[in-house]
Every structure is written in C-alpha cells, then in structure tokens.
Design a protein with these regions (language model features):
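PLP-dependent amino-acid enzyme catalytic core
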Residues: 1-134
Length: 134
C-alpha cells in the first residue's frame, strides 16, 4: 500500500461522523504480551468509550447514515450487551426513539444501562434468538 493511499485512508477516518459521539482512543503497548511473543503488540483502548466498548462506533455510523438517507425515524434492535447500549446512546444523541429487545436472562446491570440511555427495553424470551424473533 502506498503512502498516498494510507494518508487518504487516515484522512477519511479522521473526518468520519463517528467522532460526534465516540472519543479517539489511544493505542497502548501491551508490554507483557509483546515480550512473551517477542513482538510489538498494541491494544486499542475501546474500553475508554462512554459505553466501554467499540460497539458504539458501528451503531452510531449505521444509524446516522440511515437517518441521513431518510430511511428511519426510530430504531429497534435485539441485544443483551454492548450493542444495545451503543444503539441506545446513538439514538439518544441523534434524537430518535430506540427500542431494545433483550432476553429475560439479561443481567439487570445491562438492562439498567440501556434504560439510562432513554431507550425502551422489552424483555422477551430466554435467548438472543428469542429476543431477535420478537
């Protein structure tokens, strides 16, 4: 890959809408792992995001693009984890209604985290597949 192409890719990444909601997270050298593998290993610190996960990035970009194309006015998603929080936070930021369908077995801490982001939570079934089929 040429330096020109690489610079173009970096430029596109830096201008993406994802930074309307996500923070630029650092790369940190994993010293012990680097030493063990005799190589330089770096970890992208996505745990520093507002929902402690990279899932916010994909949810936000997808939802914003759908809104920009006037394809949605609200969103419904099935998830029991970080994706649920990413969708809820993205919807809140973008001013649309979010409904998150979660299995009844979802830990209360995850349910409460989604509710704090103003999404409506529907508990359905015992598994992700059950929630998804809702």
């Amino acid at each position: 890959m040429s330096l020109k192409i690489l610079k173009s890719i970096v430029n596109k990444i830096e201008k993406t809408c994802v930074y309307d909601i996500a923070i630029r997270t650092p790369l940190e050298k994993a010293s012990n792992l680097s030493r063990k593998l005799d190589n330089n290993i770096f970890i992208k610190r996505e745990d520093l995001q507002p929902i402690f996960s990279f899932k916010l990035r994909g949810a936000y970009v997808k939802i914003k693009n759908l809104i920009d194309k006037k394809k949605i006015k609200s969103i419904i998603a099935a998830s029991a984890g970080n994706h649920a929080q990413g969708v809820a936070m993205s919807a809140l930021k973008l001013g649309i209604k979010a409904i998150i369908v979660m299995p009844k077995t979802t830990p209360l801490i995850k349910v409460d985290a989604v509710k704090l982001l103003k999404a409506k939570v529907i508990l359905h079934g015992d598994s992700y597949d059950d929630a998804y089929s809702y």
